[in-house]
UniProtKB/Swiss-Prot annotation:
SUPFAM superfamilies: all-alpha NTP pyrophosphatases. It comes from Lacticaseibacillus casei (strain BL23) (Lactobacillus casei). GO terms for cellular component: cytoplasm. This is Phosphoribosyl-ATP pyrophosphatase. Its EC number is 3.6.1.31.
């Protein structure tokens, strides 16, 4: 994928293509070969890195970490057989709905 700007659906399609047609030595192939547990570990690591980066004023570092997390979540989605359209449908189903904020437990500041 060589576009200067990648869309999330295009990246998803690229990852899905790599799953179907592995390229030896590619990181995506490595993740699929290692399986779900490795992919989950990477999603967890990247989530933590996003949180840490968000606490700092360095926007480029935060952007990099969000991009890494997005990539790994898309790999997880492909591994699980979940499509971008399914996520978009779920998000659309929430549009205009009343918040259940009152039902959620209060988040205390640390």
């Amino acid at each position: 994928m060589t576009q200067a700007k990648q869309s999330i659906p295009a990246l998803y399609d690229f990852i899905k293509e790599r799953q179907a047609n592995p390229v030896a030595g590619s990181y995506t192939d490595y993740l699929f070969t290692k399986g779900l547990d490795k992919i989950l570990k990477k999603v967890g690591e990247e989530s933590t890195e996003v949180i840490v980066a968000a606490k700092n004023p360095d926007d480029p570092a935060f952007i990099l970490e969000v991009a890494d997390l997005t990539y790994h979540v898309l790999v997880l989605m492909v591994e699980r057989g979940i499509t971008v359209d399914q996520i978009a449908t779920e998000l659309a189903s929430r549009e205009g709905k009343k918040s259940r904020l009152q039902e959620r437990s209060k988040i205390e500041k640390y």
